[in-house]
């Protein structure tokens, strides 16, 4: 019994120590003297530790650290100073994976069988506030011709819009900005020379009105480049769809005829 009591005390002490590490990481990431490297090191350990890796707060703090660094760099921009743009955008991009896991854990029932989310409100608020900056990040890497990174940012914008947590909110609206981002995600994937990625992005974008003619043309090109038997079938199908959607264009009919010559 004594040994059991000692073991329980040690376990409780270890659990408390790890939760203290999570709080410390969050504290270090706050304020003008934030040390994001140290905060990340601490939270990385907590994300791997059995005592804290299944706590919503651990994952929330990991995303919070990324958000704090993003905001620290963006504050420089607001003040007319030059931010470290790669650092700023990489921190921005890093928020979502942590918050998705935190959100998932935050919806689980507590020890009394009740669901009482603690971090969901903040998660939704931060993701919504930062949403448009993913467009900026995609444009930044697109201009630098880092097309795969550009795709990642544009695609994360679309991904957030489609998260169930934002259903019925402004963040989920398929407005002109959404359609523009969706198009540039496809364009970036194509320019990155990744046909599979480009095809998926173009298929997603083809049913929205933004630059729909261009999307169909790019889709035909990508199916032609992919060159598998299934891609050849899809190429013909896309030519046929293009003829129906754009009956005044000779492009799709002429190219369909060429496939049979």
Identify what each model region corresponds to.
Residues 1-27, 242:
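Bacterial Sec-dependent N-terminal signal peptides
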Residues 51-53, 107, 162, 210-211, ...:
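Short coil turns that delineate tetratricopeptide repeat
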């Amino acid at each position: 019994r004594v040994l059991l009591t000692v073991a329980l005390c040690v376990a409780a002490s270890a659990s408390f120590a790890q939760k203290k590490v999570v709080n410390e990481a969050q504290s270090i990431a706050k304020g003008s003297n934030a040390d994001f490297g140290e905060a990340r090191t601490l939270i990385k350990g907590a994300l791997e530790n059995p005592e804290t890796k299944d706590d919503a707060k651990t994952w929330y703090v990991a995303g919070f650290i990324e958000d704090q660094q993003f905001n620290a760099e963006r504050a420089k921009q607001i003040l007319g100073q030059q931010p470290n743009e790669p650092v700023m955008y990489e921190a921005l991009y890093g928020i979502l994976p942590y918050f998705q896991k935190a959100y998932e854990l935050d919806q689980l029932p507590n020890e009394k069988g009740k669901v009482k989310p603690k971090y969901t409100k903040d998660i939704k608020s931060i993701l919504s506030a930062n949403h448009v900056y993913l467009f900026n990040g995609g444009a930044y890497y697109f201009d630098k011709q880092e097309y795969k990174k550009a795709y990642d940012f544009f695609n994360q914008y679309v991904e957030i819009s489609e998260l169930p947590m934002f259903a019925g909110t402004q963040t989920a609206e398929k407005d002109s900005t959404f359609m523009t981002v969706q198009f540039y995600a496809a364009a970036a994937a194509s320019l990155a020379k990744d046909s599979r990625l480009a095809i998926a992005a173009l298929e997603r974008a083809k049913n929205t009105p933004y630059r729909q003619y261009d999307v169909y043309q790019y889709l035909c090109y990508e199916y032609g480049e992919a060159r598998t038997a299934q891609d050849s079938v899809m190429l013909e199908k896309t030519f046929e769809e293009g003829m129906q959607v754009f009956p005044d264009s000779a492009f799709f009919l002429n190219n369909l005829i060429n496939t049979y010559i």
